Structure formats: structure tokens, C-alpha cells
Amino acid sequence: MPIVSLPKIKHVRAFTVRGGGADYHDQGEGHWIDDHIATPMSRYPDYRQSRQSFGINVLGTLVVEIEAEDGTVGFAVTTGGEPAAYIVEKHLARFLEGRAPTDYEKIWDQMYFSTQYYGRKGLVVNAISGVDLALWDLLGKLRQEPVYHLLGGAVRDELQFYATGARPDKAKEFGFIGGKMPLHHGPAEGVEGLKKNIAELADMRSKVGDDFWLMWDCWMALDVDYATRLAIAAHDFGLKWIEEAISPDDYWGYQQLKRNVPKGMLVTTGEHEATRWGFRMLMEMDCCDIIQPDVGWCGGVTELLKISALADAHGKMVVPHGSSVYSYHFVITRHNSPFAEFLMMHPGPTEVVPMFHPQLLGEPVPDNGRMKVSALDKPGFGVDLNPDIAMHRPYTH
């Protein structure tokens, strides 16, 4: 039987979108995700009450479209906005147009190493991730298969989720296996702030009972000493893990924190780490128990496959940060990814709504904290761009 050749890539386009969606933090007033949450900027009183006050939402969403010669379009969304759109249009597009969509390994390699002198992590790798995800979406659509088929197929019949949001008690009602809360007070608020954190944890434990997971997302806000004291105090209330407690660049601090926390408590991080080389540092230095790459920020699916294999060899679980369908299609195929995160993007959060609403159509959500693999059985990542959202193409090439 002759091999069927897929159409080559004809066009790459990059757009920006404002408002809630792939930029998790670009939300309106009164949203739990922007309510006095501890951050590295909390040391400055002017930037303590709101994360938007220091510009957490300045980038907005990046939309990457990749069109094949037959008119099939793959797309993806991530955080990056106009600066990332410039990188996609002016630099990365040259490595895709005229190429076969099956050449994703070579394409990734060329995107990464051509930008290494000004990239390596952060915004540039966000842009690379968006392109890579759009490429996988295109490949799935051309082959009329869901992405998880292309990654080796499902290793279980369903996904199970924990929920991130300010109301773990509601997460329990919705059937999630656990609830991860934002930490509201950082070191600059002293002992009183630490006491408020513990009081909040104690109150939530009384609401959810002893058998429901409770975790803290510290969003890089702490130092090793404060994180250690917080973990020890939280142990009495059954905190399952302490997440991203310190700067993602402080591998030595994470190594120390992992030694310091009470026995049985997990240390997790990786949301703001990127590429196999960054995660290699976390694993070889034994910085954490669970790594949490965001597939839209760490290098895309192509790189996450390498990160996951490295983690498997080191006996570490991979539980990706957020990422909606881009994470779901990956987690369902990995033995060392036993559950997934669901970001509760309702402002309350008192309802289960699609993570990237309103930017995507057809985005599945957990039912009673679970999702059947059949919910992913559509070509590519199985979602469409909402035609009603305002997209802007700031650059061309």
C-alpha cells in the first residue's frame, strides 16, 4: 500500500485576544484569581491587593493558526499576546511554511535553537509552545484523529481532576479529588499574615473533612524560611502539597525545602519552568515530588513528551498546570500522570465552566470530577475558535 503524503504547511498566522481565556489572569473585577493573592510583588504594599496592579495580565492571549495547502487549519491558544505574535510572524514562521506537518521534531529544534540567544524560557518559549500545539492540532485534523491517538493512545478510560480555586468546599461538592487554594498572605505580612493563612486552611479543612485533598498554590511568593514554617504549621491540617513556594530559578532553595517539609507532605513546582533542560535541574537536584509543566509555556507537546520521559526515569509524577484540552490529551496517554488539574475559572468560583471560556467552543469539562476519554474523540484537540471573539493580527510576514 503506498504511503499517503499529507499536504504541506502553507501559512502561519498569529493573533492577539484580550479578556479571559488562555491568559488565565486577564479577568474582570471581582474574580477570585485577582483577590489579594501572595506574589513576589507582595513585598510592595502598592501591588499587594491585586495581581493586575503589577501587570500580570499585560500580555493577553496568543492565537496561532497553521494552514495546510488543502485549507485545513490547526490552531492553539496560549499566553503571549502581541510580543509573542511578533516572534511567531517575524521569526518562527519561516521554519514551518513549505514544510510537512509531520516534521514537528525538526521544526521544534529549529525554533528553539534559532531563538536561544534571546529566548530559552518565558515569552519566547510560550510562542514556540503555541506554534507546536497548533501543529499537533493540524496533524490530528489532517489524519482525522484526536491528538491523544498520535501520542500513543489512552492508558486509562477516564481522567480524574483536582480543582484550583478559592472554594475547595465547592470543588468537593462537584466531585473533584482535591482542592488547591491560592495563598493570600506572603512574608511581607509577617506573623499575622502567616496566622491568617493557617486559619484559612483550618477553616477549609473543617468544611471538607479529613479525606479531601487540600493544597496551597504559593505562586513564587515565599522564601525557604517562610515556606518551611508555613508547611510545618499546615501539617496539622493535612496539607497534601505546597506548590511553587519560591522562585523557579532557586533550585537550591527547592532542594532545601523538600528536605524541610514534614514527612508525607509533597513539594511541587514547574509551572514556570521550561524545556527538558530546566526540568532536568529540578529532577537531578531532587527539588520536588511532582513536576507541573504548563504545555502552553514549557515548549508544547513535542517538548513535554521529553520532559515526561525524563520524569518517569526519575520516578516523578507529571501533573501539568491548567492548559485545558492541551493537557487532557497528554495526561490520558501517560502512566506517570495519574490525574489532572482543572482551573475553576468562574469568578466565584461556584460553577464548573470551561477553562478557556469564551475563546474556545466544544471545550469539555469534568463531570463529577472526571472526564471520559470519549470526550476527547474529535480530530486534533477537538475544539474550535469562537468566531464571536475579537482577534487582532498585529503583524504579518
Swiss-Prot record:
InterPro entries: Enolase-like_C_sf, Enolase-like_N, Enolase_C-like, L-Rhamnon_dehydrat, Mandel_Rmase/mucon_lact_enz_CS, Mandelate_racemase_C, Mandelate_racemase_N_dom, RHMD-like. GO terms for molecular function: L-rhamnonate dehydratase activity; magnesium ion binding. Gene3D superfamilies: Enolase-like C-terminal domain (3.20.20.120), Enolase-like, N-terminal domain (3.30.390.10). It comes from the Bacteria. Its EC number is 4.2.1.90. It holds the Pfam family MR_MLE_C. Binds 1 Mg(2+) ion per subunit. SUPFAM superfamilies: Enolase C-terminal domain-like (SSF51604), Enolase N-terminal domain-like (SSF54826). Keywords: Lyase, Magnesium, Metal-binding, Rhamnose metabolism. PROSITE patterns: MR_MLE_1 (PS00908). It catalyses: L-rhamnonate = 2-dehydro-3-deoxy-L-rhamnonate + H2O. Mg(2+) binds at D217, E243, E271. Its cofactor is Mg(2+). The record marks D294 as: Increases basicity of active site His. The active site is at H321. Pathway: Carbohydrate degradation; L-rhamnose degradation. The keyword Lyase applies. Substrate binds at H25, R51, E341. GO terms for biological process: amino acid catabolic process; carbohydrate catabolic process; rhamnose metabolic process. The keyword Nucleotide-binding does not apply. Reaction proceeds via a syn dehydration. Catalyzes the dehydration of L-rhamnonate to 2-keto-3-deoxy-L-rhamnonate (KDR). Also shows activity with L-lyxonate and L-mannonate, with much lower catalytic efficiency. Catalyzes the third step in an alternative pathway for rhamnose utilization that does not involve phosphorylated intermediates. This is L-rhamnonate dehydratase. The gene is rhmD.
